């Protein structure tokens, strides 16, 4: 019997088979993974089976024999179906194994199974109960064997793999219970997982989560399922099995269920249930193969994962559907490209995006999980920005705070277990992407600001002019004012929805009170021009000042680009280990807590540039993490990187490295003296769906001169963006770009492959490239190409060059 398309794909009362056994009912226990109680109850309700939640992971069920068979055949969420044999209260303070032995001895096992039947013991023990599980199972086995010895003078054999009579025991703090395991083995084993990837998702957990987001309700509830990190394809396969009305227990029907040697087993009724289930699946599969199938898209960065999906689909009996599926090796960074055609073909009207990301177990770099999740959310918002329906989004996370960055409306969180691992399923509808950035939604209006009208007029004029250029080049991070007026010596940069204001220290000839007043007037004018609140403006100073005239973060002053790669100051450890070990431990704990709190205070914002996302910090460093004057340079590097080995020296937060990776670089190596900045760079990689654990992407904390001297690799593209001045281990203890650039470039050229290119840039306004380099290499100044439309080409903020080997 086939199931109508608009009905649930679980059994219903219309499938009931008339039988003499139908009247008798049994009290059983159906278990599931923690957190899946609600989906399991939904299943049981649609089977018209009486049930009651007893405790975490346990549902008490009153069912007929036919209903028991149908639970074993059809339940996608259940773990085990257990028939109670005996139970007793226990005292966990005493020997629990011996109490279990005593409980088993109260059962006449010869009335339950025959001597020539094999048996096995499995059990679950509450973690609060101290007992050796192996020893406890051994003591239950001893009791059963002794019962047969006393009655029949012989013992039944044990078969741990495929017993005729599987016994299951449970122990909690107050009670022990012994069951006949009617399911035989855990019902999550569907039989199709012939190929696996790291940290696979359990089948019944995947099904329960699909229930949670409503995939099961009707065959028309979603138009598509998208799994951007599909692994071995568990979500995809479980979704297809639901759609095709597949009885998930059918592969166990031959020999693996635990009720075959139960005295109440009705083999004729069982065969009727099996035949009916097979017919339903056959009908469902034929309809799906004929085209009545939602759009299914699965992607993974690992080619082996996609091969595993194909193997598992074949093992699940779904080979006919493979031509109708999209299964591609694609990293998360290519999700926009992957979904472009389905969107164009209008196949993603009501999509479900559900995935099991590498939440730490698969990735191994837990610090970069949150950026990965945040980047996925931002990417989906961009992809579906112009669609009528926003997708339903469901993701697993190892820690609930990892999922907090997902842009989900009215988010729901389900705590559950994937095997022994506690995970959190965050789900809800994707929040539609917010409107345009500050620069694109700017409208020139009449604004009056007493005493600062000239500043307001100039700022409005600048923004109005830049708006058109920004729209043309799709730029949202740009400089809109650069000390244009002598009385207002500030640089104003727009980063998406935020304004970053840098005040240049006024000359000593201007009284501090006057400087402060002008600056406050400028801030007032900025708020009026952009129509923003105080929280969207961030203020910095580019030089240290005395007393209370310091507007920026004094600790950030040394973090400017001109000293970004200076070694971090050495800590004074002279008093660190004074006193006893207890005092040392306390001091170390305080230090770690202070470090944790400082890290927590750092507020990162995300901005977009040319299809890439970057973290910027407006408060803790003088520079933000993204040098907007190098926007065009990063675009050049991206264009030159396809199939190339790329080296980024003085990598800072690795923004150029991200563009190289997104541009299709074969490999990207980022070298910087600061591990903190490299970690920031790794977060930028993760934010863009780039796997920071792959050998393709290297992050090396090292002195640049030491590294390029010792390294022997060859690179096709090298980007060098050194500070103007820095303390360094080389060159008399300092680095000066004018003095030392020749030696730096010569060493870098030793690492440049034939046909490769070095992009060299620096921000020293009076910089002149050594004539010796023009003679030795093919050098082209490209400053005019790398200066953006928002900077003055007559006063270039940087100087840049292309350098190649001479032919």
UniProtKB/Swiss-Prot annotation:
Q: Which Gene3D superfamilies match?
A: 3.30.2130.30, RNA methyltransferase domain (HRMD) like (3.30.750.80), Vaccinia Virus protein VP39 (3.40.50.150)
What segments bear the compositional bias annotation Polar residues?
A: 548-560
Could you tell me the keywords of this UniProt record? Cytoplasm, Methyltransferase, RNA-binding, rRNA processing, S-adenosyl-L-methionine, Transferase
Question: What's the EC number here?
Answer: 2.1.1.173, 2.1.1.264
Highest taxon, organism lineage = Bacteria
Q: What is its main location?
A: cytoplasm
Q: Where is the THUMP domain?
A: 67-182
A single GO cellular-component term from the record reads: cytoplasm
Catalysed conversion reaction:
guanosine(2445) in 23S rRNA + S-adenosyl-L-methionine = N(2)-methylguanosine(2445) in 23S rRNA + S-adenosyl-L-homocysteine + H(+); guanosine(2069) in 23S rRNA + S-adenosyl-L-methionine = N(2)-methylguanosine(2069) in 23S rRNA + S-adenosyl-L-homocysteine + H(+)
- Which Gene Ontology terms cover its molecular function? 23S rRNA (guanine(2445)-N(2))-methyltransferase activity; RNA binding; rRNA (guanine-N7-)-methyltransferase activity
Disordered: annotated segments: 548-602
| Subcellular location field | Cytoplasm
> One Pfam family of this protein, by short name?
Methyltrans_SAM
> RNA-binding as a keyword?
yes
The kind of enzyme this is, by top-level EC class, is transferase
* Keyword RNA-binding found: yes
Q: What segments bear the compositional bias annotation Basic and acidic residues?
A: 561-575, 584-594
CDD domains reported for this sequence: AdoMet_MTases, THUMP_AdoMetMT
Query: HAMAP family, alphabetically?
Result: 23SrRNA_methyltr_KL
Could you say which protein family the record assigns here?
Belongs to the methyltransferase superfamily. RlmKL family.
Task performed by this protein? Specifically methylates the guanine in position 2445 (m2G2445) and the guanine in position 2069 (m7G2069) of 23S rRNA.
Name used for this protein in its record = Ribosomal RNA large subunit methyltransferase K/L
Q: Which gene encodes it?
A: rlmL
């Amino acid at each position: 019997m086939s199931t109508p398309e608009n009905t649930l794909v679980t059994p219903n009362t219309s499938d009931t088979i008339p039988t003499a056994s139908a009247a008798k009912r049994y009290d059983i226990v159906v278990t599931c993974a923690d957190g899946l109680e609600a989906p399991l109850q939904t299943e049981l309700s649609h089977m018209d089976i009486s049930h009651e939640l007893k405790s975490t992971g346990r549902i008490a069920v009153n069912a007929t024999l036919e209903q028991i068979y149908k639970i074993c055949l059809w339940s996608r969420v259940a773990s085990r179906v257990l028939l109670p044999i005996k139970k007793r209260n226990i005292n966990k303070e005493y020997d629990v194994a011996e109490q279990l032995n005593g409980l088993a001895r109260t059962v006449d096992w010869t009335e339950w199974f025959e001597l020539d039947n094999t048996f096995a013991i499995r059990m679950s023990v509450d973690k609060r109960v101290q007992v050796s599980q192996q020893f406890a199972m051994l003591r239950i086995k001893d009791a059963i064997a002794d019962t047969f010895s006393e009655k029949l003078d012989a013992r039944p054999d044990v078969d741990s793999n495929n017993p005729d009579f599987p016994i299951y025991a449970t122990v909690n703090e107050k009670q022990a219970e012994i069951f006949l395991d009617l399911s035989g083995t855990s019902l999550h084993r569907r039989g199709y997982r012939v190929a696996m990837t790291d940290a696979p998702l359990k089948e019944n957990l995947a099904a329960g989560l699909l229930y949670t987001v409503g995939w099961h309700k009707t065959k028309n509830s979603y138009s598509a399922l998208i799994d951007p990190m599909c692994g071995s394809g568990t979500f995809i396969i479980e979704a297809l099995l639901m759609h095709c009305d597949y009885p998930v227990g059918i592969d166990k029907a031959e020999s693996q269920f635990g009720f075959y040697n139960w005295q109440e087993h009705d083999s004729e009724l069982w065969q009727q249930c099996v035949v009916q289930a097979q017919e339903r699946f056959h009908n469902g599969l034929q309809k799906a193969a004929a085209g009545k199938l939602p759009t299914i898209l699965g992607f993974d960065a690992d080619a082996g994962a996609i091969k595993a999906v194909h193997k598992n689909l074949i093992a699940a009996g779904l080979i006919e559907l493979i031509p109708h599926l999209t299964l591609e090796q694609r990293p998360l960074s290519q999700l926009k490209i992957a979904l472009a055609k389905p969107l164009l073909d209008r196949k993603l009207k009501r999509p479900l995006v559900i995935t099991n990301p590498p939440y730490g177990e698969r990735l191994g770099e837990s610090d970069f999980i949150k950026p990965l999740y945040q980047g996925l959310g931002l990417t989906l918002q961009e992809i579906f920005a112009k669609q009528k329906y926003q997708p339903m989004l469901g993701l697993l996370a190892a820690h609930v705070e990892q999922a907090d960055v997902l842009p989900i409306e009215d988010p729901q969180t389900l705590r559950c277990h994937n095997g022994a691992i506690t995970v959190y399923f965050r789900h809800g509808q994707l929040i539609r992407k917010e409107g345009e950035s500050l620069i694109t939604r700017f409208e020139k209006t009449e604004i009056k600001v007493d005493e600062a009208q000239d500043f307001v007029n100039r700022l409005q004029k600048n923004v109005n002019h830049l708006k058109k250029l920004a729209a043309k080049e799709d730029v949202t991070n740009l400089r809109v004012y650069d000390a244009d007026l002598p009385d207002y010596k500030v640089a104003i940069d727009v980063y998406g929805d935020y304004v970053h204001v840098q005040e240049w220290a006024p000359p000593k000839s201007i009284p501090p009170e006057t400087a402060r007043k002008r600056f406050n007037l400028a801030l007032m004018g900025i708020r009026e021009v952009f129509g923003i609140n105080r929280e969207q403006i961030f203020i910095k100073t580019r030089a240290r000042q005395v007393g209370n005239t310091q507007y920026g973060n004094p600790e950030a002053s040394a973090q400017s680009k001109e000293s970004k790669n200076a070694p971090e100051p050495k800590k004074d450890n002279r008093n660190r280990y004074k006193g006893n070990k207890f005092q040392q431990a306390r001091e170390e704990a305080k230090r770690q807590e202070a470090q944790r709190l400082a890290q927590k205070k750092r507020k990162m914002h995300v901005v977009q540039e040319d299809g890439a996302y970057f973290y910027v910090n407006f408060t803790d460093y003088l520079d933000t993490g993204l040098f907007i004057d190098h926007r065009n340079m990063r675009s050049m590097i991206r264009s030159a990187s396809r199939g190339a080995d790329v080296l980024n020296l003085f990598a800072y937060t690795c923004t150029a490295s991200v563009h190289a990776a997104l541009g299709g670089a074969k490999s990207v190596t980022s070298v910087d003296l600061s591990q903190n900045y490299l970690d920031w760079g790794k977060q930028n990689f993760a934010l863009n769906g780039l796997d920071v654990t792959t050998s393709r992407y290297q992050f090396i904390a090292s002195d640049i001169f030491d590294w390029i001297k010792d390294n022997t690799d060859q690179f096709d593209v090298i980007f060098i963006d050194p500070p103007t001045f820095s303390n360094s281990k080389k060159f008399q203890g300092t680095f000066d770009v004018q003095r030392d650039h020749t030696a730096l470039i010569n060493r870098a050229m030793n690492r440049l492959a034939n046909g490769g290119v070095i992009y060299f840039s620096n921000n020293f306004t009076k910089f002149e490239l050594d004539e010796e380099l023009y003679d030795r290499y093919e050098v082209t100044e490209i400053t005019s190409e790398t200066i953006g439309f928002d900077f003055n080409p007559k006063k270039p903020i940087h100087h840049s060059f292309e350098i190649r080997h001479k032919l």
